Amino acid sequence: MLLKLKLVLDSSVFIQGLDIEGYTTPKVVDEVKDRESRILLESLISSGKVKVVEPSKEALRAVKNAALKTGEIEELSEADLEVLALAYELKAEVFSDDYNVQNVARILGLKFRTLKRGIKKVIKWQYVCIGCGRKFKEMPPGGICPDCGSPVKLIPRRQRS
């Protein structure tokens, strides 16, 4: 039986100790390790308040494509990707304090809730060598520029007016 409430929860919800109804994913369950948070999560699952659902491959693919566009694919954990994919699939709201998750949620047209302050605008990121300025679609091996040997950093893309 699916819940009427369409809220997909990430691990921060359980770590903060919220008694809440919604959905979560297997990877989020795996992420919750501390004893008190684990007890809360297991109690919410056994009471039926929280349903654990695995997102479809199609939804995961859509989320990964959006994360590639924003440049955040390397910053999102498998649990983050699952949370976004499940919310995308269920047309649900995401409950997360993770700015990267919020950013990709907004790109996907998903609403989100936070325990703290959320993002104000979408930021697209890119990998840039701090030495020669070369731009990369993904982090080069070891985080080092193959051209000049300098470190590569993730920075916001400049907004065009």
From Swiss-Prot:
Which BP terms from GO are recorded? maturation of SSU-rRNA
The cofactors required by this protein are: Mn(2+); Zn(2+)
Q: What does the note accompanying the cofactor annotation read? A: Binds 1 zinc ion per subunit.
Query: Is Chloroplast included in the keywords of this UniProt record?
Result: no
Flexible linker: annotated segments: 118-123
**Classification via InterPro entries:** NOB1, PIN-like_dom_sf, PIN_dom, Ribonuclease_PIN, VapC_family
Q: Which terms are listed as keywords in the entry?
A: Endonuclease, Hydrolase, Manganese, Metal-binding, Nuclease, Ribosome biogenesis, RNA-binding, rRNA-binding, Toxin-antitoxin system, Zinc
Q: Where is this region: Zinc ribbon?
A: 124-159
Would you identify the family this protein belongs to, as annotated? Answer: Belongs to the PINc/VapC protein family.
NCBIfam families recorded: PRK12496.1-3 (NF009146)
Name this protein carries in UniProt: Endoribonuclease Nob1
What is the phylogenetic placement of the source species in the record? Archaea, Methanobacteriati, Methanobacteriota, Thermococci, Thermococcales
